[in-house]
Amino acid sequence: RATRLCSALVLAAAVPLTLPAQQRTSPKQFFGHDIGADYELPNYSKLHQYWIKIAQESDRVVLDTIGLTEEGRPQIMAIVTSPANHRNLARYKDISTRLAKAEGLDSAAAAALARDGKVIFWIDGGLHATEVLGAQQLTETLWQLSSRTDAETVRILDDVVILMAHANPDGMELVSDWYMKESDKLRRTTGTIPRLYEKYAGHDNNRDSYMNALAETRNMSAQLFIEWHPQIMYNHHQTGPTGTVMAAPPYRDPANYWFHPAMITGLDLVGAALNHRFVLEHKPGLTFRQGSNYSTWWNGGLRTTGY
């Protein structure tokens, strides 16, 4: 669970920004400003248009509509990987499903499937619409993954199928439109929104993942638990702890003892890789364990239901 740092910057930690790129329309060219520019919040309609454009321009990106929202908007998910992997997506999806269900698999068969498959990596953003960075980082990350040609990005795209899902289109449309309606930039705020930024649940849409009462939750759950079964899922938020930049695994002790230890240590491995990279690049601000209030208990949110 990230805090005040987009996953685009996690990728940016991996490679310099001054790299040759394929010719793709940049966010600045499309929106008129960089993602994250002060006093600018594109709405979901504009984000959707931009994602369509990137999918048209890039053979690394396929745009899928995973369902409709409670207000009838298309909820989109970008599938990002190498062109060669796109030609074999059905096979990699099947491998991921077989490994997740583990029906009739012994250790040798599972190891063989793991060698043949690709990592399925889920990134969602925008679940809590007033945590505006979540939806914005999806767009920045999509552009970087579709345009970079450095060796590390190419390797990532060869090894990984990245699923980038917008978690709350209705909320983004409402919050961005409300914010941008004020002509005086210094008076723009998300603090006076007149209604819920998810039609029925508002901020509590992150308490729905074990019930699937909301259309948006059902759309994402179908991708997570029926279609793709990703091995890693990154559920982006933008909130405390105060004084930090990002919270990551390992989570607070004690770990949930109902889970297989390998699941917990797998989370810890991902967090250790993040922490190690930030340390090497002299980028402070990552916190974990008792430094944050996030744990592996209460398994009803988008992140924790996946456990």
Regions found by a protein language model. Give the residues of each.
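Structured catalytic-domain cores with a bias toward divalent-metal coordination
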Residues: A21-Y307
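N-terminal secretory signal peptides that target proteins for export/translocation
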Residues: R1-A2
